[in-house]
Amino acid sequence: MELHAITDDSKPVEELARIIITIQNEVDFIHIRERSKSAADILKLLDLIFEGGIDKRKLVMNGRVDIALFSTIHRVQLPSGSFSPKQIRARFPHLHIGRSVHSLEEAVQAEKEDADYVLFGHVFETDCKKGLEGRGVSLLSDIKQRISIPVIAIGGMTPDRLRDVKQAGADGIAVMSGIFSSAEPLEAARRYSRKLKEMRYEKAL
């Protein structure tokens, strides 16, 4: 299972850059999801993390296809309701395109529109969406049975829930507050990374 870390749009550029650089070796992908920041601020963030040695192949630009193209980042995440994957692929066929979905119908539609994968959530109740009940691992399982592209699960992901998500068929997990709201982001990322490695080891036995 892949481990995706998603920025939470709550930190100044310099602090966020330090966290990203610190956790880069513990995660598979880092999604830049800074919706309140200007293009100039996001470009400054990218400059800082490139200087810090981040592997550009690990970066996913959420929503800002323009910045991805300008910065030669080849992975983009399209929010629900934005451009369709098919529209983006027609113009920029080199991009690897994810689509955020919240239902079985949206997941099926994303596959039809040529998304490379879907980000489904929120699976469990989460601090990011307080008061909203999670959509559950049962729906996650239903989606996996209906589509053939990878499904990344997001929402309320904690290390002790990863087995349930794996059993439902998820190809990876995405974590926002569990890492970026932690007082110790590196140790938080390591807890997820260790749990995933432990699960892979058990499967190999």
UniProtKB/Swiss-Prot annotation:
GO terms for cellular component: cytoplasm. Substrate binds at residues 102, 156, 176-177. Its EC number is 5.3.99.10. Pathway: Cofactor biosynthesis; thiamine diphosphate biosynthesis. The active site is at 122 (proton acceptor). GO terms for biological process: thiamine biosynthetic process; thiamine diphosphate biosynthetic process. It catalyses: 2-[(2R,5Z)-2-carboxy-4-methylthiazol-5(2H)-ylidene]ethyl phosphate = 2-(2-carboxy-4-methylthiazol-5-yl)ethyl phosphate. One of its GO terms (molecular function) is isomerase activity. It holds the Pfam family TMP-TENI. Disruption phenotype: Inactivation of this gene causes a delay in sporulation, but does not affect cell growth and the production of extracellular enzymes. It is an enzyme of class 5 (isomerase). This is Thiazole tautomerase. The lineage of its organism: Bacteria, Bacillati, Bacillota, Bacilli, Bacillales.
